[in-house]
Amino acid sequence: MRALRLLAMLASSACHLASGQTDDMCNAQDRTYSTETMPAGTHQPYDKLNPVVGMLSTKFYVTVVNLTPHRFMLEGTHSYQMDIFDFGDVPQGRARQNAVKYRGTWSTRDDAGEAYYRIDGTDKRFALRVKSYIPSSDPRRVVLDLSGMGLGQREYVYPGGDTAVSLVITGSNRFGFQASLRHGPGNWMRNMYDVIRDRPVRHLIMPGTHDAGMSTITDKIVSIGSEENTQNQGINIYDQLQTGSRWFDLRICSVHANDDAGRNNGFWVMHVNDEMATLAIGNTGESLDDVISEINRFTSENPGEIIFFAMRYLVGRYEFPDRGPILWNAAIVDDFFSKLRAIHNRCLHLDTNTGFQNHKASYFMDHNEGKGCVILLLNGHLDGRESPADGIYDIGRMTIRDHWSNRMQASDMVPDQVNNWRSVTRGGGASDYGSFMIAQWLVTPDAVATTAYSLQNFAIQPTNPSLYWAGVNGMDPEHWPNVLMVDYIGVQQRDQWAWNRLSAEMYTLAVGMNLYMASENCDVGRRRNPLLRRGEMGMVESRGVPWNGIIFANGTTVDDPDPMLHLGRVEILRNGTVFGNGTVVEQSMPNPWL
């Protein structure tokens, strides 16, 4: 019998080989992406940005993004003193915004709820917990407990009223899992080289940062631009690179003495209402020297990446910017180009006969002896905007569709962006979209609103969280943008910009979109989805030492906790606790899910 089974296996293998269906070839029949309709989500109402109104909110969300070939199965829930505790399955390739509504406006120490998930086809499990802590300035918290996957636990505070905490998971049981509780290696592209090397750049998905150098206010011009209405990022270029960004919207100006236009006080990142206006309103951010230093630090530590810097403005302004722009003369241009030549891993003499978006990823990643490419694209007010011998190129070398919604509310911006990327198709021969698409996942509030509530709050409360349910559910293997450009990348809590306070949703989303979503499209990933291949070495394994620690809400990390410690876990279910099937506990009992 054993011999017969062996012969059957060999015959089956021979049939697969004869039909060309090896384990390394993409087969449309392997597709796991789910097309089922997800429950509608809810955007944060505008009035909740008011901290007084937001503080009185009783409704919050926990969003789960599934970029794996496995269904996330809800096994059960229980809640205490909650009017709504609505959790459900998360199918492959989809996201679910799970809703929580507390019974009372003021939290008590007894408010609690737990949702237990199993990853279908595996022995992996995770739990989502909502708990109140009294006394505390941030009493309502969420714990994402992935210790059952070997990925640790993290405690979060909601960024505002009617807002979400998000969890992104990618990978597979065969490949290994990765989640957004913490950042992975800085060189995420190099880590998936075998996955993306043969894909053209227009088939890659990457994070981008809007007004990337505006991570600080340096006041090199005299204007009313402030942190609230002019700063767009909380972390510098180096940390933006570490959080996964590979497309940088960088706006550079020279700053000149009021009494001497010929005296250049240096090149600075700038964010103003109009760089060509008679009166420019805004402020300066990082110096170009600091930006270059941060780029070089990152690339020395993380070789092999493709990094784009799209540089705009490229004019001068007086310290008091009320006399219009100063167009750069040859001396200023030479000085600027000299600065750019200090950037390491520029790619000289690239083939410009082919649009950069059509080159394979490996073309750039293999440059500089495998150290990758820092690609400088100039798009400002210059004549002669390139020097290929220096690795400096006109932005026209790349066909780009850069879509800005110009909407104040996330609820208006989101459908506009989704409709834009769904208007084109990825893969499919002649129908394959040939340009590089930038989705500006941004809102554009007016000056009054930004000054009152800040660009930071607009980013971390209504806008960025919506990407992980509305944005993800607007994508599928044939429809997605190349760049997801955001403000305040990595920032989950207001003004918490230290590395240990950042969260890795955008990083993990980028990894998962390339690893899972694009790989589900056989016209994009000609090789079999790496998450389904036998014997595939995953990113998780390549990271080395496994981690199953705990990150607390204040950023404190415990790398080797007691295995019985699970933040927010309810040991005894009190009478009045409601199970997911509607059963109400009449007498306190041990938690059956432990």
Where are these regions (language model features)?
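Conserved, mostly hydrophobic/aromatic
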Residues: 251, 309, 484
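Catalytic cores of phosphodiester-bond-cleaving enzymes
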Residues: 277-343
